């Protein structure tokens, strides 16, 4: 049994190379897996299921094809695509996951997250996130005119890129104390997340026990996938082209 986990593809029409790599990944690897987990920022931006482009519909159709072959597909919101809704998931044949979600991999409980809520030292972002992800705010955003939603998406994307460049490295990375706290709260010794674009496997202690935090990589010059199978956890890059 093989489970694949990816995140931070930031799919966008301006990066057809990443889209081609993802479609190839679905055909060559995901279609052979028992499950595929996509842990947020699947799309560079998402302004609502009612505004899907032909590019996004093609991605949904490709996911559905994999799901119909027997691979269970799970999707978690990221900070760029938190407006993805159930309509897209129905078209894509995938299940929308809560953040965080506790699942069983290789017979052991594992916590899955996008990862932005672990960056608690970024106080300005956390405050902005709480306002934006409030159910009332989400409802209002989904009911704004499409032109206004497109304008806001461009504004937030540009602001996010600027802030990442300006902020200190430790602020936009996870807060070290937050990791064991949330792992202990959910009773797990393995945490898997994306968001930071810093792929690595970190060893730590949780309540005096050996634990690990696996950070998925973003897809840019290369792609990243975490494969979980009978031999363990394997985080590996692969070429985009």
From Swiss-Prot:
Cofactor binding note from Swiss-Prot or TrEMBL: Binds 2 Mn(2+) ions per subunit in a binuclear metal center.
Disulfide bonds: none
BP term (GO), one: lipid A biosynthetic process
Annotated GO CC locations: cytoplasm; extrinsic component of plasma membrane
Binding site for Mn(2+) 1: 8, 10, 41, 197
CDD domains, alphabetized: MPP_YbbF-LpxH (cd07398)
Known catalytic reactions: UDP-2-N,3-O-bis[(3R)-3-hydroxytetradecanoyl]-alpha-D-glucosamine + H2O = 2-N,3-O-bis[(3R)-3-hydroxytetradecanoyl]-alpha-D-glucosaminyl 1-phosphate + UMP + 2 H(+)
Topology class, membrane: Peripheral membrane protein
Major subcellular location class: membrane
GO MF annotation terms: manganese ion binding; UDP-2,3-diacylglucosamine hydrolase activity
Positions with a binding annotation for substrate: 79-80, 122, 160, 167, 195
EC nos: 3.6.1.54
Main enzyme class: hydrolase
Record key words, sorted: Cell inner membrane, Cell membrane, Hydrolase, Lipid A biosynthesis, Lipid biosynthesis, Lipid metabolism, Manganese, Membrane, Metal-binding
Domain of life: Bacteria
Location in the cell: Cell inner membrane
Known pathway: Glycolipid biosynthesis; lipid IV(A) biosynthesis; lipid IV(A) from (3R)-3-hydroxytetradecanoyl-[acyl-carrier-protein] and UDP-N-acetyl-alpha-D-glucosamine: step 4/6
UniProt cross-references to InterPro entries, sorted A to Z: Calcineurin-like_PHP_ApaH (IPR004843), LpxH-like (IPR043461), Metallo-depent_PP-like (IPR029052), UDP-diacylglucosamine_Hdrlase (IPR010138)
Positions that bind Mn(2+) 2: 41, 79, 114, 195
Cofactor dependence: Mn(2+)
Coiled coil (residue ranges): none
Family classification: Belongs to the LpxH family.
General function of this protein: Hydrolyzes the pyrophosphate bond of UDP-2,3-diacylglucosamine to yield 2,3-diacylglucosamine 1-phosphate (lipid X) and UMP by catalyzing the attack of water at the alpha-P atom. Involved in the biosynthesis of lipid A, a phosphorylated glycolipid that anchors the lipopolysaccharide to the outer membrane of the cell.
Name of the molecule in the record: UDP-2,3-diacylglucosamine hydrolase
């Amino acid at each position: 049994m093989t489970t694949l986990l990816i995140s931070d593809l930031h799919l966008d029409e301006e990066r057809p190379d990443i889209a081609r790599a993802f479609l190839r990944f679905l055909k060559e690897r995901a279609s052979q897996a028992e499950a595929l987990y996509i842990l947020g920022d699947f799309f560079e931006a998402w302004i609502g299921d009612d505004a899907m482009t032909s590019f996004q519909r093609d991605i949904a159709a490709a996911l559905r094809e994999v799901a119909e072959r027997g691979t269970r597909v799970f999707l978690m919101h990221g900070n760029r695509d938190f407006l993805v809704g159930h309509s897209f998931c129905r078209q894509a044949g995938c299940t929308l996951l809560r953040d965080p979600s506790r699942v069983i991999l290789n017979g052991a409980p594992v916590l899955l997250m996008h990862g932005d809520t672990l960056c608690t030292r970024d106080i300005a972002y956390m405050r902005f996130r709480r306002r934006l992800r409030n159910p009332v705010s989400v409802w209002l955003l989904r009911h704004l005119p499409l032109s206004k939603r497109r304008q806001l998406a461009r504004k937030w994307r540009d602001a996010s890129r600027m802030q990442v460049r300006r902020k200190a490295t430790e602020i936009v990375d996870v807060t070290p104390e937050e990791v064991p706290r949330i792992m202990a709260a959910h009773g797990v010794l393995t945490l898997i997340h994306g968001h930071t674009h810093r792929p690595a496997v970190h060893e730590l202690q949780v309540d005096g026990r050996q634990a690990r935090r696996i950070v998925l990589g973003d897809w840019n010059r290369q792609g990243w996938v975490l494969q979980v199978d009978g031999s363990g956890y394997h985080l590996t890059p692969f070429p985009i082209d």
